[in-house]
UniProtKB/Swiss-Prot annotation:
PROSITE patterns: RIBOSOMAL_S7
MF terms in GO: rRNA binding; structural constituent of ribosome; tRNA binding
Database matches in CDD domains: uS7_Bacteria (cd14869)
One cellular-component annotation, GO: small ribosomal subunit
Quaternary structure annotation from Swiss-Prot or TrEMBL: Part of the 30S ribosomal subunit. Contacts proteins S9 and S11.
Described purpose of this protein according to its UniProt entry: One of the primary rRNA binding proteins, it binds directly to 16S rRNA where it nucleates assembly of the head domain of the 30S subunit. Is located at the subunit interface close to the decoding center, probably blocks exit of the E-site tRNA.
Keywords, in A-Z order: Ribonucleoprotein, Ribosomal protein, RNA-binding, rRNA-binding, tRNA-binding
InterPro entries: Ribosomal_uS7 (IPR000235), Ribosomal_uS7_bac/org-type (IPR005717), Ribosomal_uS7_CS (IPR020606), Ribosomal_uS7_dom (IPR023798), Ribosomal_uS7_dom_sf (IPR036823)
Biological-process GO terms, alphabetical: translation
Family as reported in the entry's similarity comment: Belongs to the universal ribosomal protein uS7 family.
Protein name: Small ribosomal subunit protein uS7
Highest taxon listed in the record's lineage: Bacteria
NCBIfam families linked: rpsG_bact (TIGR01029)
Length: 156
């Protein structure tokens, strides 16, 4: 814990093409070894593929997909009297977005298509239709929270 008070959170700049902070966060998450140019190309190419396949605006599909992936509840382990309980808690908006992007990329990387841009486009299209591995991860998280609803009174 810092002794000099709260550390200011650094804000990301919106990306140049879509003017969206969420797209910038997606690009930052795709990026490996500091290669932002490669990450941007993957992201923008995936958005182009989405536009071709769906015939809709890529940003609309992306926003729908993100809303379908972002979790509302999650469980957190809480130790009380020697027993560890999985306590359901609401997810803060910032964390919802981060988890959504993380789950989407994990699911995209596990897919079978040849290139990352095709995998990402496929996962985003699936997520916008409420299918795919990332949406399943969200449903599993919600089921876990629902199953442990009895321990909700142990919330932090």
């Amino acid at each position: 814990m810092p002794r000099k008070g709260h550390i200011a959170k650094r804000d990301v700049l919106p990306d140049p093409l879509y003017n969206s902070k969420v797209v910038t966060k997606l690009i930052n998450s795709i990026m490996l070894d500091g290669k932002r140019g490669v990450a941007q190309k993957i992201c923008y190419d995936a958005f182009e593929i989405i536009g071709e396949k769906s015939g809709k605006d890529a940003m609309e599909v992306f926003e729908t997909a993100m809303n379908n992936i972002m979790p509302l509840l999650e469980v957190k382990a809480r130790r009380i009297g020697g027993a560890t309980y999985q306590v359901p808690i609401e997810v803060r908006p910032e964390r919802r977005q981060t988890l959504g992007i993380r789950w989407m990329l994990i699911a995209a990387r596990k897919r079978g298509e040849r290139s990352m841009r095709e995998r990402l486009a496929g996962e985003l299209l699936d997520a916008s239709n409420n299918t795919g591995a990332a949406v399943k991860k969200r449903e599993d998280t919600h089921k876990m929270a629902e199953a442990n609803k009895a321990f909700a009174h142990y919330r932090y």
